[in-house]
Amino acid sequence: MSKNNKTTEPTAPQALTAQFSEQIIDERLTPNPLSQFSMDKDALRLALVTAQYALRATRQQTPPILNKPTGLLVLVNGMEQAGKGTAVKQLRQWVDPRLLKVEATVGDCPLAYQPIWQAHTKALPRHGDVMVYFGNWYADLLYNVMRMATSDNDNANVNANDNVNDNVNDNKEQSKNLKSKSTKSDNDKALPIAQWQAYLQQQLIKLQAFEQDLAANQTRLLKCWFHVDIETLQARLNDDEADPQFLYQIDWNSKKVIETFNQVATVLLRQQDDWIIIDGDNKSDAADHFCHEVLQAMQTALMSSKKNTVNTSDKSKAKKQAQQALKSAKFEPVKIPKCLKNIDDAEIDKSEYRDALVEKQVRLAQLLRARKGRHIVFAFEGMDAAGKGGAIKRLVAPLDPRDYQIYNISAPMLYELQHPYLWRFWTKLPNEQTDRISRIAIFDRTWYGRVLVERIEGFATDEEWQRAYDEINRFEADLAAAGTIVIKYWLAIDKKEQLKRFEARQETPHKQFKLTDDDWRNRDKWSDYVQSAADMLARTDTEYAPWCVIATNEKRQARLDVLDHAIKQLSAVCGS
């Protein structure tokens, strides 16, 4: 099976100069929009609350409308004392505060074994809502980068008493900071590429991809970077009481720290051109500017919501779309591999099975203990009655029940549909903040439903499920890059054996609950599911998250094969 590795390669880092370039901020600073347009504050306030209610109203909950409203996530970052709090306070006063969600972080060390964005996904707004998020994943990133950058410097131990006030006169030009253009000296020597710079650029590539996936799934982002010059910053720091929770947990009184932060900000803003930079020297003007940017973003989200509202009352049209999916000019189905057609049904002796099962379960438990806290995600997919539940039962038998969580994935709930598609899986991943013990997640059906049942039943558009292959690959690549072990299974069964198991379930009272009308309906579309599975395996079998196809006509052997593959994967990572 071919391996897909479509992760974006980072561009070569650019060396920073010894003299901090102020041009990036200066060129990107935008004037207060209220000075450009004939909109006073009263008009802006009315427009904001009107747009807020109009956006909320797009979130329809009744059929037959397939409604895909857009949510708005406002990321607020930048310098300390730059007017961020004042701006968000004004926004909340001008809109209906009950409908505006606000979250805040100051930045902390990214959690072990999970992508930098993962800890923040539960806070994402529902479609049709607006949320302001201070700090967010960029605060965690900047916190980590600043720690690396200060340790990279020759003077790693920054003198906390090296106050900006001591050097204001000597640094008059730099005190104007980031708003007046500076000319680089011909003798200005380039610094070598620092470790923190390469790390930052790599993380920004991943975050940009994550944010693009959010936008493609009806969550629009507005990214606002608040900037203030050094003299104003120092004056505000002197006026306010000391804050033990300074943004990014750095000492904003230190000249060296600010110089380092400016270098970090330069790399970030060079690489990402979607930040709105707001001049925070005048807090009132900054608040007006911020509110205007939020208004424009809400209006754009509103237009997107209306565009995405599709009338699906004509069921025959939706069915026809699903039938024509395989004929899409943008998508070429793959040839169905033998492992999905020729299912091995070799039997194993019952006593031999029991001995092997115990041996493999003991070995699996040893490897899981040796993984030293690394997160593990087991993903089970397969045809109905292929034995996912039985395989999972044997997989967890040797484990402490506190060590793992099992998620039985079915049709999404309404609130889950009001978030990006992958959101309901992001929020179930092992989390260092909440999962003190259970850092193993086992999914009985997974995020691959988008390219299986949703594709076949027409619950996702052609564009959505075809795009999902790359989205899923990026998701799993981020998990693997963070140190999470991803183990994926496709349990293969033939049509004859499936019918045999369906009939057995019908005749067994304590198993009748396992058989539903959907199971029979899915069976009628057997060939569609086999083709979709083949396409899925071909497009999402990667080096960092490979598929393992298990023949399950013979249940006992299948359960042993599931354990064998887990042992093999964990041995490669944790040692033999």
List PLM regions with ranges.
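Glycine-rich phosphate-binding loop of ATP-dependent small-molecule kinases
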Residues: S2-S576
